[in-house]
Amino acid sequence: MYYFVTASKDASIYLQQPSQNTGRDEILEISKTYYGNLKDISHSLIKFNTNSISQSIASGEITASAAELILRECESSEIPTDYTIYAYAVSQSWDMGIGTRFDEISTDGVTWSSCKTGQNWMSQENHSSDTTGSFNGKGGIWFTGSFSSQSFSYEIDK
């Protein structure tokens, strides 16, 4: 039996555009890119409403013991032949916002600097020891005890 759940909200946030919101963009970006000595990182945030799933598991309607997150690659360039993607639970609530990647840089909603318009991500010091984040409290704070990862390895055709 398959049970499909779509995201209730999503957005990408960018180190080099710390006040940009992409809550209405159709593309989620995950990257670590270097432009000479300049590093740019993008994180994607995805929220699922799990209340109905929890109720269906409790009632026995859903008996599956595993779940999958399916993301598709789109217009990628210069992907390394070996890499791993990690998924962590974000420790704060956040607002999706209404921006897209190429809108004005400042749009309401989640950004690298803030989880909601006018509300910065909490610093690491304000969280328990089972969370981590960037050194300056920007880019999100996430739980470290529970995560999922997927590694990819490609052989280049000769």
Feature names for model-found ranges:
Residues 1-158:
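Secreted, disulfide-rich extracellular signaling modules
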